[in-house]
Amino acid sequence: MKVIRAKSAGFCWGVERAIQVAREEARGGVRRVYTDGPLIHNKQMMDALSREDIREVGDYQSKQDLDLPENKDKEAVVVVRAHGISPQRRKYLKELGLPFRDGTCPDVGIIAGKVKLHAEKGFAVVIFGDPEHPEVIGLMGYANGQGHVVSNEADLLALPAFEGKVAMVSQSTMFTHEFQKLSGMLAEKYPDLAVFDTICGATKERQSDLLELVKSGADAIVVIGGKHSANTKKLAKLSASHNRPTYHVETADDLDEESFS
């Protein structure tokens, strides 16, 4: 059996950066680090980080109060997840009185900046993404009540009529072709639509590499990554949409060897 490894396999640079931030603050386990929800959507890495005293204390969407011990170490550090958070959440975390580090992926920070800027200018801001994903929840916090999330064509058609200017961005881990389709539809209704393709380069690269594997005639595709990761779930969906047997696994133990015999 021949195994072909995609060129872009592995964590993206934004995830690597968040891990680095947490580890810098942990100082090899000398100082405790609390993360507001999962730092990244990869259980195995989060388990590894927990052994370095980097502990997840928030919920998946970073909405609930942190479950900190009553005798929390005042030298501990709170680290923001790679997916980013809303301004309101940021204020809450800083008010905890603990040192604070931001692990937000810079690409997500750029999207938040575009949402904030255009909302302040009076634009209605349409965000293409999953309304339940922590990245989108964080972005909506910058929209000043003028944000609208769409995840498909039906959502787009259900949008209210906008009287003023409209801008559109995307969650960083969405399908490029779907964003192009929906932004094109919205531009037909609002010719002056300000469109920002904010799908990150790593996402595009991985989707492109997967399609290359499909075109090369691969008989099956194995996508390795967290079951809650938007990136890996999208890759598995993309592979399956091209009628390839697709296996989304987190570890080698998840592989069924008989499926490849």
Predicted regions span which residues?
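The feature marks the mature, well-folded catalytic cores of soluble enzymes
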Residues: 1-261
